[in-house]
A protein has these predicted regions:
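An acidic, low-aromatic, low-complexity terminal/linker signal
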Residues: 1-149
């Protein structure tokens, strides 16, 4: 299965490439009141509102730098973007590379690739379920998904 690799601080992560819609340069964001602490704001992406998340805050990493790129992902009727420090490339991963499940529920598992370990993210679990419930969850709905139309 193909994944796209990226870095947050000095740690490398991957996400299945089929969940990635695109990678864009960091646009101007509009701040919103009363959103979860990890939501940096929203932007207009091709005529659609896109919520942009600080993944470092969401997974408990230190660091104030947000990175220059935003990875736009979609999974199970939601769509959002998150800042990445850099893209490391495309990785071909097979199940024999799975190392162990992570203690953080948003993270999938660790994978050994050559001499390094990479953490695989579970796109559909990145946003906490409680933040998808109620009116706040509308921020993350994919407007192009017929279920949300």
């Amino acid at each position: 299965m193909q994944h796209i690799g990226f870095k947050l601080n000095d740690k490398e992560y991957t996400i299945p490439i089929l969940k990635v819609r695109e990678v864009i340069k960091s646009p101007t964001l509009t701040k919103l009141p009363l959103v979860p602490h990890y939501v940096e704001g929203v932007t207009n992406l091709k005529g659609r509102v896109l919520a942009v998340v600080n993944l470092k805050k969401l997974v408990g990493l230190e660091g104030k730098s947000l990175g220059d790129n935003i990875m736009v992902v979609g999974s199970d009727h939601i769509r959002f973007g998150f800042f990445v420090d850099s893209i490391t490339g495309i990785l071909n991963i097979d199940e024999s590379q799975f190392f162990s499940p992570s203690q953080i529920k948003q993270l999938g598992c660790s994978i050994q690739i050559s001499n390094r370990y990479v953490t695989m993210l579970d796109a559909k679990s990145l946003i906490p379920a409680e933040d998808l419930d109620g009116s706040g969850g509308k921020l993350f709905l994919d407007p192009d998904d017929p279920v949300n139309g």
